[in-house]
Amino acid sequence: MKEDNKSNWAEWAIKHRQIVYFFSVLVLVMGIFSFKTLGRSEDPSFTVKQMVVSAAWPGASAKDVEMHLTNTLEKQIQNVPQIDKITSYSRPGTCVITVYLKDEVPSSQVRQRWLELRNMVNDIKKDLPDGVYGPYYNDRFDDVYGNIYALTGDGYSYEDMRKYAEEIKLDFFGIPDVKKVELVGVQPEKVYIQMDTDKLAQLGLDINSLAEIIKAQTAITPSGMVEADKSNTYLRLTGSPDSLQNIADIPINANGKVFRLGDIAQIKRGYADPPESKMYFNGKPAVGIALSMEDGGDNIRLGKNLAKEIKKIQSELPLGLELNQVANQPEVVKNSISEFSESLYEAIIIVLVVSLFSLGRRSGYVISCCIPLILLGAFCGMYALGIDLHKVSLGALVVSLGMLVDDAIVVVELMEVKMSEGWERMKAASYAFKTCAWPLLCGTVITCLGFMPIAFSDSSASEFASSLFPVMTITLLLSWLVSATLAPVLGYEWIRPTVIKEESYDTPFYNKFRSLLQWSLSHRALVVGITVGLFAFSIFMLNFVKKEFFPASVRPELLVELNLPEGSSIKTTDEAAQKLTKLIENDEDLDHVSTYVGKSAPRFVLVMDPVQPRDNYAQLVVVAKSIEGRIRMEKRITKLAADNLPEAIVYSRSIPLGPPAPYPVMLRVSGDNDAQVKEYAQKVRQVMNANPEVTMTRMDWMEQSNAVKLKIDNDKLLQMGLTRQTVAMALQAQVSGYTVASYLEGDQDIDIVFRLDPDQRADITQLETVSIPTSQGAVPLAQVATLEYGSEDNMIWRRNLRPTITVNGAIVEGVTGNDVTQKVYDDLKELRSNLPAGMKIEIGGSLEDSNKTLKGLLKPVPVMIILIMVLLMLQLQDIRKLIIIVITAPLGMIGVIFGLLLFNSPLGFMAELGVLALCGTIIRNSMVLVDQIQQHLDAGMEPMSAITESAIVRFRPIMLAAFTTVLGLIPLFFSQFWNAMAVTMACGLTGATLLTLVVLPVLYAIAFKVK
């Protein structure tokens, strides 16, 4: 491309230095403001495209719920556009359906899809079985409760703690950046009316009639309104129950007499029995207070404001009540940003030192002044685009740091060379721009395009890392702009002509390199063969690189999940969870532990998926004093659980750095027949157990729970004046209690529950003796029903409307879940080839997500390749040159694979991003070399000499650019999140640069038949 002097930016900038300085200072000031204003968080936000639809059908078995409730809802839900998958589980009396949208659905349309789903499901409410409550919807899964506090107090009841927690909740709402405040582990109070069946029978009452009397006395109903000439007067009835005494005073008409309810029944107040989900802090009962932050808020500022408020609250709490911090996201964010800031500072120092030593003092000063301007300009761009400071955006700045000086180095070095040859300063600056500016811009855009697939991929992992592309693009384009304007100005001001050097490339080093090039050009076939062999060998070695979607984080938390057999009561789970807590409470590495029974902890970090409530499930969030302590504790907890809780499956895991998977190894078995699915799931589990790298296998649906079927004799019911409802209510009252009404007390809606005296509540072995009250007296259940003892499924899982069992497994130390999953799946080859029609065995978990993400990441690659080729063609204007450059791009894989093996880094999502980004950088370097060959040819040099001398002339700037990029990446080698990408880019660029300087000249000579 030819350059008109009128559009020579460097010359214009030097002539208008005051304007350049003004805008440079303006960018510096705006950049500092932007940096201080940017939101701060640990992870970038991304849209969780899932929704939970739940419904209750009291009294129905899991199979009935699946067939008549879950199935009906799922069939309607699948008609919603852009549904990716539907998973569900059905339990006795409950179904929970999780709906996932396709990754391609834009975040802006997610709420609209959920509204459509609500409307479509509401349309079929009338078709649901009688007695169904709901459906209920939850689509707010992206709220992160990063600050959790536990209120504990010896001698304080749950209700006492709840009241204080409610007051604290109101205080928190007044703090800037607070979005939501939720209470965790609250135990609702209930009023229990207890009496025996004989008393009911004597009074001629049944539970249904008693319930109607109590409900009529506690209901709030309109009493009318008197319309006057100028105002309306509302009539209010007083005396509705608002205390135990008022409930005891409710009149009961029975056998022609009026009794006080308190005279014929015992009235007590207590907590829900069985209890609701519970929370403990360091083994003490607790009420949790969880806060989420406003979108775009500043976590560090929120942390400071919370610290002030907590100090005030603690000073006002009564003696014995303690407010403890369970999760402290602001502190995590502060440490995370501090870590990446240190990496950024280290990278800046490294690049500055390299620039000073390689370019000399004055040229180094020019580069040193460009770096802060580019970085602060990047902060301005981030502020304009609404990109917060977090691990991805800060990491992107570190990655770009080594590249952002490349353009300035080329311009400044060329100015220095021309000035050393006696050129006048303005002419040298003008020549540097005219010669390098547009090829460098083309190369910069190509480098940016290498990151494009991250931004335009439709996977959740890509959305997680999507800020990488805009931050890199802003930074690198700014670096080109600065190299075209400020760098020439500063070079004009500071660089002084040096002694003219004759034959500056006639040194021992360059002579040896020239000899290597000449030998390579004389043995072209051998060089190409060696290169192809190295590439093929590296691809073979790829089999030995470990695969991991996202590594574990460096957070101190350890998530310990406890699963008891299906059908276990929440009380049993509570006992097991407390036992496990006691086993670890004195561990030397433990800082604190919070225990959640019946459900998981709130989502206190974005990359954590909360578990839906289950009676047989508990979660311990163990916070260690250090990362090393966390690793030690994980091993000890596994052994303690195996030795002391053999009835439970206890699995511990650290929090991942990206989208999570519940277990490292996950395989799904789906089919049309429940029995077949169970049979083949058991076979899959056997194969999984046979793998020495897999431990603690479990299936999410297998065990059955006890059940008793009551065959009612309708004729006897008729003779005794009973109904099925009367029998059901009598059974419920005697087994678990029957809610007959509720009343308002303060801000609470308290249920009134009727149940029989404790000594009359039946156990499973005495069901036949349960008394059923009739008008003639109580009769045993055996007189009206035949009992059949058996078992039934307590949980039925489905995926896309088909019965599905997921077989899960943990892994031993030193292997990755993706590698082990693939091995187990390969071991199932024979079983998979002989499956009955309709049966499927599929990969799940992290490996499935990884494959899906890679597929999504590759979708935009054709567009990226086309854009890169268009730019190359416009710049080079020769198809053979374009082909040569494109061929060199894969050479980076040689260094990538050997680098991953050398540093024991996994091939995962971040490494895949590094490979794509690396291609753009390699193409950029190759283009610069090809452009130099053309310049020498245009100057009249012989083709062979042009090829050789171009590689020599460009050796220093290309190596220097690669060297600064690689050294700038070194701080990220120590980052858990960025390690794989840093290793990929550093090792790939090192290998590709060395090969490019030798192989590209050979390919050029072959393509153009240079002799």
Please state what every model-predicted region is.
Residues 22, 61-68, 105-115, 145-150, ...:
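Solvent-exposed, non-transmembrane alpha-helical starts
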Residues 401-415, 436-456, 463-503, 620, ...:
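Transmembrane alpha-helices and their membrane-interface boundaries in multi-pass membrane transporters
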Residues 18-19, 25-60, 122-131, 383, ...:
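Transmembrane helices with small-residue packing motifs
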Residues 30-37, 349-416, 474, 867-954, ...:
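Hydrophobic transmembrane alpha-helices and their membrane-interface caps
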Residues 2-5, 12, 54, 125, ...:
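Extracytoplasmic/periplasmic membrane-proximal domains and adjacent transmembrane bundles
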Residues 9, 326, 337, 412, ...:
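Helix-loop junctions and hydrophobic alpha-helical segments within the transmembrane domains
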Residues 2-40, 434-436, 502-550, 591:
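Signature of alpha-helical transmembrane segments and their immediate interfacial
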Residues 7-8, 65-139, 198-219, 240, ...:
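Solvent-exposed, membrane-proximal periplasmic/extracellular interface segments of envelope transport
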